[in-house]
């Protein structure tokens, strides 16, 4: 009571299809890293808790404000390239999950870059690799810049009722 209200959104962007199979979006979007960040509803992972990697290292659910190019290079081979607000880790924080910010209040003195290639040309198979880099994860508030780079690859294969996933 007596506090201002707040609305939280995961996604709010404008997307422009500037060429066949290629688009640019600007706004608030989910970062294209990991297996479940973009589709993170409970039926996309096993159990009631997310796995430790996509909970603590890849901070799913992770969204940022920025701009991103997406498209299909060839049938079944797609790309995503984004420049966006980055994580903000204060002194003593070390988990990327702790660095997520509310975009409306985000410190964005140092932008981050993310890229992903994803292969889905074979039915039932997904291969992907992502990289996310930020020159200063302290957003200029530390005594020196602390850079961070996150590499991720994964495979998901499904045949009938059998599924194999590796991250």
Residue ranges and their predicted role:
Residues 3, 11, 21, 93, ...:
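Residue-identity detector for glutamine
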Residues 119-167:
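Detector for outer-membrane/organellar transmembrane beta-barrel domains
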Residues 80-82, 90-95, 130, 139-141:
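A short secondary-structure junction signal
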Residues 41-47, 96-100, 146-147:
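Flexible, surface-exposed loop regions and adjacent strand-edge segments
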Residues 1-89, 109-114, 118-126:
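Outer membrane beta-barrel
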Residues 2, 54-60, 101-106, 137-144:
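Outer-membrane beta-barrel domain signature
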């Amino acid at each position: 009571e007596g506090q201002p209200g707040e609305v939280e959104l995961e996604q709010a962007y404008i997307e422009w299809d500037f060429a066949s199979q290629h688009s640019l979006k600007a706004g608030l979007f989910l970062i294209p890293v990991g297996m479940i960040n973009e589709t993170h509803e409970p039926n996309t992972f096993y159990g009631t808790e997310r796995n430790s990697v996509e909970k603590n290292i890849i901070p799913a659910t992770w969204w940022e404000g920025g701009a991103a190019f997406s498209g299909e290079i060839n049938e079944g081979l797609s790309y995503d390239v984004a420049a966006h607000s980055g994580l903000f880790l204060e002194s003593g924080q070390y988990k990327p999950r702790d660095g997520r910010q509310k975009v409306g209040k985000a410190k964005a003195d140092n932008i981050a870059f993310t890229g992903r290639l994803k292969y889905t040309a074979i039915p039932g198979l997904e291969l992907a690799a992502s990289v996310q880099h930020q020159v200063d994860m302290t957003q200029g508030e530390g005594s020196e810049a602390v850079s961070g780079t996150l590499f991720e690859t994964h495979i998901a294969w499904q045949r009938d009722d059998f599924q194999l996933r590796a991250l």
